[in-house]
């Protein structure tokens, strides 16, 4: 019998977002999350594929959506064949018994290429030597799963811990992506690129990442779903040590790390430095082109469109292992099902330097065209189907105008002609960008306290100047570096006002610590955080950061920020054209201001707008019990207006 522990829990607590939902009153109804002490256990026969006791094990449980909850949870159900997983593990073990080589330190040793198996999985021979995998007892004939535990339900995939009967009860991590996208090509590209990127980080950069044992990019394998099988690392997340809003007695960043006046900075810096070390390692090698990393022997790639000579710095025994192919940047694939995959691939790279257009300009241009083509396809589909939703069609037409402007301005923002920016040539070199560089994705191994980087999904190679700061330290609001000098009347303010300014200070402080750590490790690249550079790349980052249809307004806002600063940029050699490339009428300026205000009002007045209506399950349960969240007649949930003093 197979034992299946299922652990129910949420990984994060969200700030309240709503004019009608007061944080103070809500938080009185919410207790700090406690990880369940003991997982629920279910026993099942491995061969009994119809055992109803398994169903809960595959269902999404870490949150509830205020709208369309069942639909959202169904998309995150990760049902797979346990028997199929067992057969894959046993097949891997058979391969491992024939492989005693477990290290490839010398550049004269050829590292074996990924192996495509008859069961339509791909195994990694360099990671499955018998010395790494473990052995069976003499009286056992095959690998058997003993327990499976659901340990994490993330934004994009679910993670299971699989314990086997191999020596020392060898465990593995099984990652299964959610079927959030309408086409299989999205998941296929992401998995194939992520595995190749992890392999690159392991072999070329010598970084600590979980080794991939086996993977499948589609559902035609024994598990019946795409998956990645990795080594299991026993440890705890670095996120446990990260408290971004911790109190800071000095209320000033200048005191520095380890100061007796402000010892709290040492705690924050411990996390920041660990993340900055990974960041520096990712940027320790530059590439000859941009895109995403794949294996050269990937049969699903179009050999005519990939770039072979990806870098001049590769080890001699690894030069024929990887190529650059289509970018898997999330926004470039998200909600693009109305556009045929063949059409999408035209604008996904890879991109290489040419005499007329820099890599950066090519990426900006193609990103804009891709969004434009997708919006046009959506509009055509709506009109063809005779949709009566004229508001949506009007909105899409506004998006089309926005993306046309991004395409128009794409060649005027970032180039080697920006002489006023120090080390501009270095900033334009493509390096690896990790979109989820976050303490949540760093595991500290228990025995050695070695940090391992997890989850490289969506990683891309692109110019450093186009890379934004990690989200865990990102802050675009007003900066406060020293509460005493920047806010001299601080002590006279109300408690609510003081908390507001302290919040801005803490966000400023965290960003400052990050930029300081980057400067210490990559001083030639620090200009990427300079305010003018951020403004120049803002149209690009605003496109990538879109979460809802109305976020095109934020892309428009980047144009107006640029227009305001353009004369200054030209005077100081940051741009080459004297005239701002876009023109707007007074009516358009007024309309944008109205649209931007409406968008901000909607974000402020809509509870949990920042998470598109998703609420962590423990918070949801507490708010339901408190009468704050109520189920309506349609099956959706509404948030009650409650008394702040209650």
From Swiss-Prot:
Q: Which GO terms describe its cellular component?
A: mitochondrion
Q: Which Gene3D superfamilies match?
A: Phosphorylase Kinase, domain 1
Subcellular locations according to the entry: Mitochondrion
- The signal peptide annotation in the UniProt record is none
Q: Does the keyword Transmembrane apply?
A: no
Keywords, sorted A to Z = Mitochondrion, Transit peptide
The organelle targeting sequence, given as a residue range: 1-34
Q: What is its main location?
A: mitochondrion
What family is this protein classified in? Belongs to the AIM9 family.
Q: What's the protein here called? A: Altered inheritance of mitochondria protein 9, mitochondrial
Protein's organism: Candida glabrata (strain ATCC 2001 / BCRC 20586 / JCM 3761 / NBRC 0622 / NRRL Y-65 / CBS 138)
The top of its lineage is: Eukaryota, Fungi, Dikarya, Ascomycota, Saccharomycotina
The gene behind this protein is AIM9
